[in-house]
Structure formats: structure tokens, C-alpha cells
């Protein structure tokens, strides 16, 4: 099976290096890496030695909660379509695959290459996606860590947010459409990737709809997929996520929690294909343990 592994990253981590080394051994795979424009691309020059690894020349400024993550993802999908593939995975630089590649390919064939994308449901807390797009958010929202002034600004925004209404949002809703939310990390078949890029190339209004929206990467593609009528979506309510990604948002102290040896058994028993996030110094031994059969 021809697969594309698309990575969004801002630093060269041990998990990223291990994933590139693992998947590049199969010459039918293509690995495409987007490096945040704020990062030093020279740190990633070692990946140029791999014949099936591409470092995107088109780089975006990825700010927490902003459209940069969506723009970077679109660039990855566009580059992927320049290559032959059956299936694509969107990953972070802190992800590790937790099955061997033969199992991965067999699983994808067994589900008829259905799309692995998670829409929020009873398995996770509900967040109203409309609030992400309904307003034009000022730049001080796009910070992962905020100071006292930012908190005051946000309070002021909540009091006067009616003045920042997104008119495109109301046009979309009044036409009978709705927004959907889920995890930004997904697996898509070739037809879905092609349909997404074709739609975006012909409908610039959809990008305008999300201008100055908040954390749009969890809404943009989920809503688009529903809007254009893609319905070959994998679903298994016995799994933690329909995207088959293992993430610990519960135990802390960081959210999501950095995974280690104590999580290996839980990850393997979850039935997930990938897990995140792993520490930057994660060992090869842990990676090997992850891919062993339960």
C-alpha cells in the first residue's frame, strides 16, 4: 500500500526522527514534513538524506489557536497529491505508531480505506463549534500562555463580542448548514484528500469563513467533509477515538500528558494505530515495545 505520512512540527524530536526512519524504509511510503516558519529549517536538514522524505518549501507561521495550522495542513495535502498514494495520515512531531506496518496496511484494507477522523460525541466532552467561528477573534487570543493584560482583553472581548460578529458565519448557518468539531489528527483516503483540495481550489469563500476564527483546525476539515458529502467514515464506539489515536487528556499534569513506559500496555490494548504525545527524548526501546503484538 502506498501511504503518505504528513507531519506538522516546530522542532526536531526523537519521536519524529524514529518515525521518519521507520516509515522511510518502505519505499512505497512518502513522508512530507511542514516545519513552522519560526523554526530553523537547518535543524531538519538530516532528513534530506532520505529519498522519500520531503521538507515543504512553503512554510506557515503556526500560532496556537490560529489559522496557520489549517494553512499548513492544506499545504501538506496539496503536496501529497503530487505523489501516488492510497492513504494519508496527518501526524505531529510527537506521535508514534503503535502497530507494525503490516498490521497497519491490513487494517486499512479491512476497513476498505474508510476515513479515520473523529467527530466529538459521548466519548469526550462537548464543545460548541459555532463559538469558534461566530466571531472574528483579535490576535491576543492566539497565545498558548497568556499574561494578565491578555486576560483583561479577553474579558473586554466577551462583553463586546457582538461588535466582532463574523458575517460569513451567519451566511453559512442561514443556508441550512452547521459546523462540526473533532480531533485535528486524521487519516484520509486519496479520494477524500483530492475532493477536499478540489473544493478549496474552487471555493475561496470557505477559507474566508474561518478568517480570525479560534482553534479552527478542530472544525475546518470536519465541517468541510460533511459539507461536501463524504460519508465513508470509520466508526467504532468501543474505541477511544474514531481516528484511532491514543491521547491522555485526563491524568495530567500536562494536557495532553506526555506518555512513557507506564502507558505502553494501555496504548496497545486500546486498538489505536498512533499515540501522542511522547517526550522529545523517548527511547528506541519504548518505540519497539509499542509495536509488539498484545
Tell me the role of every PLM-derived stretch.
Residues 1-294:
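ER/Golgi luminal nucleotide-sugar-dependent glycosyltransferases, focusing on the catalytic module
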